[in-house]
Amino acid sequence: MDPFLQDHWGDVHTSLTTYARNQLRPQMPADLRVRVEEYVGLEIEQDEEEEVLSRQKPDVLVTENWSSAEQTAIAVSEAAVADEPLVVTTPRESETLRRVLIQDRRGDRLVTAIEFLSPGNKYGEALIHFRKKQRELLLGGVNLVEIDLIRGGGWAVFPPDAAIPGSHADPYRVVVVRALRSERFECYPAGIRQRLPRIRVPLRPGDRDAVLDLQLLVDQAWEDGGYSDIDYARGPLPKFEANDVEWIRERLAQQGIARIL
């Protein structure tokens, strides 16, 4: 896994969802279909490091009149009356997120939801909202496949942080939860130094699991996105652990890139 792809996650995320759909479609029974769905996620206030992980968007300004009732909360001297201001607010930003859905053609029943997490899923209220949606999907009988290839942010995949061994949680997390066995979490190791796993994608009871090769998806996104021009001399955020920095230097030196970080 190339951790520098995180700096270009908007483009990479779009590619991963599309390629995942394409990889899964030939494995579907005739009465199931695979679709990419767009939805709007919240962007919240973040500290400097977290802000780097989020996409920049144009500001949208909304104006409103300030009512006299709202002004009563402010003490005004009898000798001086302030001019009434024009109040300008900036709403919470939103970003378009995507996920892969497997549906039963008969009645459009949702069978499995596959999510490649984005920075916008992993902070503050957006994280709380994401976890709420997870619970709703499971209660509705939907299988969950959650793939977190983002370094930094809160624990967003379904099982509690403490339930996942460190070998399967750092720095990336891949978890499958079957709706009929929601107390069980199928966890796959996913690190910087190893090949990303081939994971089982559950369908309906009685259907054979599909297989999703995550490394093939990332390789294709890297190739098709033309990311050979990444500036490896500039370390991404969040910073790497010292032992990872040394390993990355060695790998890039083998490819003729002499200096990074």
What positions do the PLM features span?
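Gly/Pro/Ser/Thr-rich low-complexity, intrinsically disordered segments predominantly at protein N-termini
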Residues: 1-261
